[in-house]
């Protein structure tokens, strides 16, 4: 009986993957772990607070802030899908993940990545409607339209996850099962396959082009029209207001699309596994930290709502 159980456990262990993690073979693993843990807490707190502010402050019940709250929710889920497993594994010494766990992690990651790309396109269209079509804005971006746009973003993201995850996990992995990443990322996992994945890589490349092309076209068109309108404005105050409205969103767009292009569209010969891991860490850990800061520190409405919430809490304690 014991021998049978041990054999079963060994077979299970042999099918598990090993995640490299950010701290592998580092002389400063403790320092890196502490910094990562603090960034994780900052991102959780910042995004949760942003969602709470938007939902509790009536002045923030607008389409723009509705989309920002969805972006914050996606960032929270990004963090919870990838980072806790790495942090716990570093403490317990268990860096393994089962094939089913790997597939689940990959599905949620791809779903969130796809949904966020389309959400940024929806946010760009919202900024276009606000700046270029102010009189029609209440009709163009009413509550039903906003809910439909967000639902479409989630559905399209799920389609991405449902298409790529089963195919990736169906390949035989007969080389080393050590994934050179801190989570189950498609490019890192494909490097472990002993079968020919060149056709699938081409299909994945085309899928990424289609997934990024439509949002890029919407974002580019929206900001081209916005910049054209700004150029025609005679008011300096109008210039500043229009640019302030769009600048925060453009920063997030450049961060996310730059990282996505590097990871999924640049040929693997142009970057190493270590560089891939750093880029992955940037947009799964650092970007969720930056998003609340970009949207709060640069936004008077959010800072005003935060001060109002803090004052009301202090008055309640008195």
From Swiss-Prot:
All disulfide bonds of the chain are 102-194
GO-annotated biological processes: detection of chemical stimulus involved in sensory perception of smell
Q: Which SUPFAM superfamilies match?
A: Family A G protein-coupled receptor-like
Gene3D superfamilies documented for this protein = Rhodopsin 7-helix transmembrane proteins (1.20.1070.10)
* Topology Cytoplasmic: residue spans: 55-62, 126-144, 225-241, 298-318
- Which keywords does this chain's UniProt record carry? Cell membrane, Disulfide bond, G-protein coupled receptor, Glycoprotein, Membrane, Olfaction, Receptor, Sensory transduction, Transducer, Transmembrane, Transmembrane helix
Which residue spans belong to the Extracellular compartment?
Answer: 1-30, 85-105, 164-200, 265-277
Q: Report whether Disulfide bond shows up as a keyword of the record.
A: yes
Listed under GO cellular component are: plasma membrane
InterPro entries from the UniProt entry? GPCR_Rhodpsn (IPR000276), GPCR_Rhodpsn_7TM (IPR017452), Olfact_rcpt (IPR000725)
Which molecular-function annotations from GO does this UniProt entry contain?
G protein-coupled receptor activity; olfactory receptor activity
Where in or outside the cell it occurs: the entry states: Cell membrane
Predominant location of this chain? membrane
Q: What is this protein called?
A: Olfactory receptor 2T3
Q: Which gene encodes it?
A: OR2T3
């Amino acid at each position: 009986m014991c021998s049978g159980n041990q054999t079963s456990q060994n077979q299970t262990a042999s099918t598990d993957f090993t995640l490299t993690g950010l701290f592998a073979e580092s002389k400063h693993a403790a320092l890196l772990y502490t910094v990562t843990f603090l960034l994780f807490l900052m991102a959780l707190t910042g995004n949760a607070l942003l969602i709470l502010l938007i939902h509790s402050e009536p002045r923030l019940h607008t389409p723009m802030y509705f989309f920002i709250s969805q972006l914050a929710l996606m960032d929270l889920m990004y963090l919870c899908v990838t980072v806790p497993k790495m942090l716990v594994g570093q403490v317990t010494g268990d860096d393994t993940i089962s094939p089913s766990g790997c597939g689940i992690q990959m599905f949620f990651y791809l779903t969130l990545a796809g949904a966020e790309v389309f959400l940024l396109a929806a946010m760009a269209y919202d900024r276009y409607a606000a700046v270029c079509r102010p009189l029609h804005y209440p009709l163009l971006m009413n509550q039903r339209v906003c809910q439909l746009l967000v639902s479409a973003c989630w559905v399209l993201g799920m389609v991405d996850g449902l298409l790529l995850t089963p195919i990736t996990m169906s390949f035989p992995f007969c080389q080393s099962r050590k994934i050179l990443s801190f989570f189950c990322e498609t490019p890192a996992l494909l490097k472990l396959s002993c079968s020919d994945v060149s056709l699938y890589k081409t299909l994945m490349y085309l899928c990424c082009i289609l997934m990024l092309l439509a949002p890029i076209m919407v974002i580019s068109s929206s900001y081209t029209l916005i910049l054209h309108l700004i150029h025609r404005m005679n008011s300096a105050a109008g210039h500043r207001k229009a640019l302030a409205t769009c600048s925060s969103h453009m920063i997030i767009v450049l961060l996310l699309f730059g990282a996505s292009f590097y990871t999924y569209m640049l040929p693997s010969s142009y970057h190493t596994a270590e560089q891939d891991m750093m880029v992955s860490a940037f947009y799964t850990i650092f970007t969720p930290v930056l998003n609340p800061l970009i949207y709060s520190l640069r936004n008077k409405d959010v800072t005003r709502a935060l001060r109002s919430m803090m004052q009301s809490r202090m008055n309640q304690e008195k």
